[in-house]
Amino acid sequence: MTKLVIHLVSDSSVQTAKYAANSAIAQFTSVKPKLYHWPMIRNLELLNEVLSKIEYKRGIVLYTIADQELRKALTKFCYELKIPCISVIGKIIKEMSVFSGIEIEKEQNYNYKFDKTYFDTLNAIDYAIRHDDGQMLNELSEADIILIGPSRTSKTPTSVFLAYNGLKAANIPYVYNCPFPDFIEKDIDQLVVGLVINPNRLIEIREARLNLLQINENKSYTDFNIVQKECLEVRKICDQRNWPVIDVSTRSIEETAALIMRIYYNKKNKYNK
């Protein structure tokens, strides 16, 4: 079998590039591919990190990047290394422009519907909904990512955002003085990520939630000492098992998900420098 290294670089989820790569690979019976995923590459700092990885593990580069500056930097780098650098839809866009006489817009908006990626995304969204808030723990083995954290640390919206990028994410709440599921005692292949937040900020979010629901009796839910202990305990659980922890105090859902995706694909890529 001929080994073939393929780097998938994208400013979104790499699902389009991945689908194109797998479709092409299917035409070869004697190829053993190794795919490296580099999602959410949206600035030069992130791109430069990826370029160093590409130089270390040289192979074909497939990309879907809208930003012109990033595209130029990527293609120039690959040209200097003398490795193929292929825009997954660049040729299609160019031919459509020539045929129609319509100029290509500076910033392209990629929309892909009803392909394998689309249905994979639907399955991931369905999984995220069914495995929200600690439900159906017997199916955690099907997850790509498992999020743990105190209540109201954006686990659910982050799971859904990951699902929109084709990743199956389950989330499990940590509640002070309540037994945590025994899955943490097992060796698991899934990426487990702890989400924590500044206790004062978390109390504000919880108080707003209680006011919205017109609930005034749950004192422990907004007690500073308990909230602080919940966050500290999640950190402790993760530190003991070498699971990454993300502080979401100042991060948007998209930023949190992007960081999780980078951790996930870095783990999957398994670089050993």
Curated annotation (Swiss-Prot):
Its EC number is 2.7.11.32, 2.7.4.27. It is an enzyme of class 2 (transferase). Keywords: Kinase, Nucleotide-binding, Serine/threonine-protein kinase, Transferase. InterPro entries: Kinase-pyrophosphorylase (IPR005177), P-loop_NTPase (IPR027417), PPDK_reg (IPR026565). It comes from the Bacteria. Disulfide bonds: none annotated. It catalyses: N(tele)-phospho-L-histidyl/L-threonyl-[pyruvate, phosphate dikinase] + ADP = N(tele)-phospho-L-histidyl/O-phospho-L-threonyl-[pyruvate, phosphate dikinase] + AMP + H(+); N(tele)-phospho-L-histidyl/O-phospho-L-threonyl-[pyruvate, phosphate dikinase] + phosphate + H(+) = N(tele)-phospho-L-histidyl/L-threonyl-[pyruvate, phosphate dikinase] + diphosphate. Coiled coil: none annotated. It holds the Pfam family Kinase-PPPase. GO terms for molecular function: ADP binding; ATP binding; phosphotransferase activity, phosphate group as acceptor; protein serine/threonine kinase activity. Bifunctional serine/threonine kinase and phosphorylase involved in the regulation of the pyruvate, phosphate dikinase (PPDK) by catalyzing its phosphorylation/dephosphorylation. Belongs to the pyruvate, phosphate/water dikinase regulatory protein family. PDRP subfamily. This is Putative pyruvate, phosphate dikinase regulatory protein. It comes from Rickettsia massiliae (strain Mtu5).
